Amino acid sequence: MKLTREKWENNFSEWFDWVIREAEIYDYGRYPVKGMGVWLPYGFKIRQAAVDLIRKLLDAKGHEEVLFPLLVPEDLLRREGEHIKGFESEVFWVTKGGEENLDIRLALRPTSETAITYMETYWVQSYKQLPKKYYQIVSVFRYETKATRPMIRLREVSTFKEAHTLHETYEDAERQVKEAIEIYKNFFEELGIPYIMSQRPEWDKFAGAIYTIAFDTIMPDSRVLQIGTVHHLGQHFTKAFDLKVQRKDGTLDYPHQTSYGISDRVIAVAVSINGDDHGTILSPVLAPIKAVIIPIPAKDEKETEKIIEYSEDVAKILVSNGINTVIDKDTEKTPGEKYYIWEIKGVPLRIEIGPRELSSNSVFIKRRDTLQGISVKKENLVSEVVKLLETLRKDLKERAWNFLRSKIRYTDNLEEAKKMLDSKAGIVEVPWCESNECGLKIEETTGARVLGKPYDSPRDVSKSTCVVCKKPAKTTLRLAKTY
Amino acid sequence: MKLTREKWENNFSEWFDWVIREAEIYDYGRYPVKGMGVWLPYGFKIRQAAVDLIRKLLDAKGHEEVLFPLLVPEDLLRREGEHIKGFESEVFWVTKGGEENLDIRLALRPTSETAITYMETYWVQSYKQLPKKYYQIVSVFRYETKATRPMIRLREVSTFKEAHTLHETYEDAERQVKEAIEIYKNFFEELGIPYIMSQRPEWDKFAGAIYTIAFDTIMPDSRVLQIGTVHHLGQHFTKAFDLKVQRKDGTLDYPHQTSYGISDRVIAVAVSINGDDHGTILSPVLAPIKAVIIPIPAKDEKETEKIIEYSEDVAKILVSNGINTVIDKDTEKTPGEKYYIWEIKGVPLRIEIGPRELSSNSVFIKRRDTLQGISVKKENLVSEVVKLLETLRKDLKERAWNFLRSKIRYTDNLEEAKKMLDSKAGIVEVPWCESNECGLKIEETTGARVLGKPYDSPRDVSKSTCVVCKKPAKTTLRLAKTY
């Protein structure tokens, strides 16, 4: 069977809504508050696998998990000027408790720099306690005025992993930015999510940051989605909160901070990037169910019973080897109907067991990504399944990376850049002198969003000139249609 | 050394504040919103162990984890009349997004019956889908007017495990109530938390329930703390939300529900119940660190280095056997200062390693609960540590249960009941005719809180009469000073 990616690529938005609904990942559009949805059991397990992975990676680098209150008093949130400017139009405010008006408005946390810096004034006095690396996994809230989208642009971002670190020096915070980038790279590598890293332009960095490094990916419809950010905050918040620590030389000074976050969007990408017109394809790293067994009924009822027994035996072997496997025993559905739904759900392997498999003591295994099948003897079951899962994981990852790479273009002509972007180019790079003025001009002319300059793999622009001012280019500027 | 429980028992409130602060479990009273605190890294790990355990127990019984939005629109929350009456004075309301007034007020979830029942109208159509067992672990919010207390009475309850189930019949929901009770019993048994189960009186059941079974425990100060509740909701919410399903016989009817919850209070109890004047004592089931190694410096610096090396070797052996162990290498603190802080933190075992241990290839292990020590040869290290942890776990549990049992009294004299309660009796049972009128009279006369009638171990009251009306008693009524 030919696995097409027509709907996936050309009607992605519709495809995505269909998959998260039919695969029972995330219920969106029915809960009666705009921009808020429900993680369904299957989706919750995918989410949990991602959460477990990021915890493991952060803990291994000495991060400590904490849990702060949801509510931030207005005066705290207003303490750092740039920060509140960036967020104030998007804050949900609690103003009442019962029928009493509260003395001070309480914000649903849009992010936690202010709350955490405030508490650090109690916790940290000396450089000897530094660096400190905290993180929490919580909901954050934004009163988005843009069109909301399930898992991608929400008013309640229900899986926000935010890390907040504190350092004696600017340089140590910069080292932390690099550590955070390595952690996120490992995270995305493990999940098979391709990414590109850019330093956001001055006019699009995090409100309160010195600079922001962002991870972006390209969705099936060629639009770019930001999936992770790392900020060097310098002393902006420590000064605003008058947080001073004793330095090694005995003087008191404001320590330096970083913060970095990832969200639900990681799951949205994991579900999207490996998809086709049959549904999603989950990397085995995230898949709650690694293999689904579909018993193929025989004409003879007793034989069917034996097939079920045999299927249970196969499932037991796999489960006891740590490979979560379910049998779809529904007697009201045909095997074909079962294939349909489990393909939408993206279970990596399907194991078909019918009379032929029963009599030959074998199973027939189909990979979700290719739908190619092989017959496997029962005695080789575990080793073959492990091998297939690993091959599938690698193949998915390679395909996803190839897709991303195929969507990055270069031109030194601004008109052409605009045309490329209008015809789903993905990301277009143009040579740039690095001035804000030219950057803003490029953004305006192309009607695209500026992602910033390359952080990872800069192009050689030594012979190029800025597309606007024609002065020698210092780097490239990345442009895209974004979410 | 004699381990006293003076402060623990007689100044419990102060003891508790001291422990959670000094052990770095929960930062309370400094975050600038009343009734909200911060889970610190050490406390977060204790919390996580409890969360992992309840997840394991619920999943094993077919519960599915989901995640609902925080915000509940006012009209949804008002749908079930009794429910909103019980909660409305305690709801935090979001009324603004940015500077815009919202069309409808949004409640910070006080609990999720309404949100979940609403979504179930989309999800469930047929008895074939039943029973459904959902749960989520989230923050819930109550605008408490009573005095707030860390982890015990909060405005943000940041670890609320709420389960919500749906059933074809009243009887199946009743079966679920029993299943939930078994799950909670297993949970508390495993954590070594003693409990007593009561059916709450009519006037103190959950707002919207047919009946409520509660788990209570007795704190060191003899006051009773509710630590878990299980509610039979009948058709109250399904009727309010017009949720009908097709029954086996083809008719449409409102299904029956249960809900059950536990909270942060479980951690508060785990920290409190096994304590003494040196701090908390954590059951190995919850302890993030099972053993702490304190190297005792030698006079000779080289020997001290060898002691450190030897300590690292010991730690490595334990960690590789799944026993999380840390070495306190701080050179600015004396061993005595280290004992002090690790005792507050309640690490189950302390391993002292000095010149004597180094030369004899042994370690000296002290149990936190008794501070009794034994010398153990290195070759027996793992088996001895495992044995000690298990003995300590059992001993803690037994002591805690003995404490609870010693605090349950019986009298058929109301005056005496009042006296007992005023002199820290814990729980007092009196014979009761089971009428609301007499129950309320008992509550009024004693000035105590009525916990309800025994669910677990009812007394034989066949020869007794109600303390108020003198008619034959049907059961006992439990009274207590409560949190």
UniProtKB/Swiss-Prot annotation, chains A, B:
Source organism: Sulfolobus acidocaldarius (strain ATCC 33909 / DSM 639 / JCM 8929 / NBRC 15157 / NCIMB 11770)
Protein name per the record: Proline--tRNA ligase
Subcellular locations according to the entry: Cytoplasm
Function: Catalyzes the attachment of proline to tRNA(Pro) in a two-step reaction: proline is first activated by ATP to form Pro-AMP and then transferred to the acceptor end of tRNA(Pro).
Listed InterPro entries: aa-tRNA-synt_IIb, aa-tRNA-synth_II, aa-tRNA-synth_II/BPL/LPL, Anticodon-bd, Anticodon-bd_dom_sf, Pro-tRNA-ligase_IIa, Pro-tRNA-ligase_IIa_arc-type, Pro-tRNA_ligase_II_C
Keywords: Aminoacyl-tRNA synthetase, ATP-binding, Cytoplasm, Ligase, Nucleotide-binding, Protein biosynthesis
Family: Belongs to the class-II aminoacyl-tRNA synthetase family. ProS type 3 subfamily.
UniProt KW Ligase keyword: yes
One of the record's GO molecular function terms: ATP binding
Location (main, coarse): cytoplasm
Keyword Cell membrane annotated: no
Record comment regarding domains: Consists of three domains: the N-terminal catalytic domain, the anticodon-binding domain and the C-terminal extension.
Entry-linked HAMAP family: Pro_tRNA_synth_type3 (MF_01571)
Pfam families: HGTP_anticodon (PF03129), ProRS-C_1 (PF09180), tRNA-synt_2b (PF00587)
Top-level taxon of origin: Archaea
GO cellular component, one term: cytoplasm
SMART domains linked to this entry: ProRS-C_1
UniProt-listed GO biological process terms: prolyl-tRNA aminoacylation
Lineage: Archaea, Thermoproteota, Thermoprotei, Sulfolobales, Sulfolobaceae
Quaternary structure and interacting proteins, as annotated: Homodimer.
Catalytic activity reported: tRNA(Pro) + L-proline + ATP = L-prolyl-tRNA(Pro) + AMP + diphosphate
EC number(s) reported in the record: 6.1.1.15
